[in-house]
Amino acid sequence: KYGKRFFKMTATGLKLKESEYKLLMRVKDAFGNETLYEKPVSLDILVVKKDGKNYLLVPNIIFGAYKHALDSAGKEFRDRNMDTLSKIADIYRKYPGYGLKLEAHSLNIYTIGTKKYDDEERILLPVTERRAAAVKDALVKLGMNPAIIITEALGSKYPNAPVDDKSQWWKVRRVEFIMTENK
């Protein structure tokens, strides 16, 4: 839409500094004269479009097993979680015309369709609801308008790492950030 500042980039898995982004433009006129224009570009927001949603490219909020406190995964993740929340609040100060959807996830290691899986999901769904609420509360304390934040507890429907690899379990217990049109 005209007038909106939305940048789309493909996630590469690399952590890039702002100074590593460059605008390269080659201009060629009707007579064949050509010039190359190069300029560093400072991007303060990166959005990855996936499954029709605009995911903010920031570290996910990570939690300990069956926990919803922002510091439940240890000091390293507590500090990272707080940095991420500050970044999100800063983004929405700059772009107040957008909404924010928080998608909360959990880890279920049991096979889908089994009684163990269903029993575990009944425990995990309320945990993901509390995770989303904890993140929303923290963002509101950082000055965000609660009216633009919606939450969705997804349980273990969408793991982002193999659930059979214990070393990856921490990645699955998360809250992700989606930029939405503010209705």
Positions of PLM-derived features:
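Periplasmic peptidoglycan-binding/tethering modules of Gram-negative envelope proteins
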Residues: 2-101, 113, 180-183
